[in-house]
Amino acid sequence: VKNIPSGVNVLDGNVILPKSRIWTYQQGFNKGGLSGYSCEFRYKFLYEYGGLFVDTDIVLLKDFNLDKPYIFISELNEVGNVIATNGLIYSQSGTSSEKIWSDALDDISYRNKARLIHGEVGPILLNSLVNKHKLKKYVLQPNLFCSIGWFETEKLIDGTQLPNDAIGIHLCDAKSKLNDIDKKTFPHVSIIEQLKRKYL
């Protein structure tokens, strides 16, 4: 891995899940994608260690406190329902948090991975487990991290502005690729360009 920022520790992912366990989607828009495996990896990481897991396509805009036993971000789906999503998850280490992650790992182990499609073991599974384990009080509102939905990624480049209370932004990389959004060419006023000026 190149261009690793200073202060970042690079560790061997085989400690969490061995390389032999890597799998990809075999169908759907994200065919060949690793995001399903990434979900399994994060659930195993949280089960074993607890802590904070953040996708690489989330940009943090402000500091925020990890002062609760869990933190889940949420998004609006296409019909306007708020659902927990797994782009950023915080789970305090300890036995009380292990059940939700063991349930997630059990669910994935029972699935036929050749038939899975994007989202099934990510937001869909996580949202059902948050409800099952009565953890909805730890779910942040969508505007804080996912003010732009995965189905409206054109807003990243059309001049749409982030809400003032946004803590971060999920760039929805898998869908951005699908929608042919080239993050190297974008209007000056776009969210992408503003992020570039601020952080690059």
Roles of regions detected by a PLM:
Residues 39-51:
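Small-residue hinge/turn detector
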Residues 1-39, 54-200:
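Glycosyltransferase-associated regions of secretory-pathway enzymes
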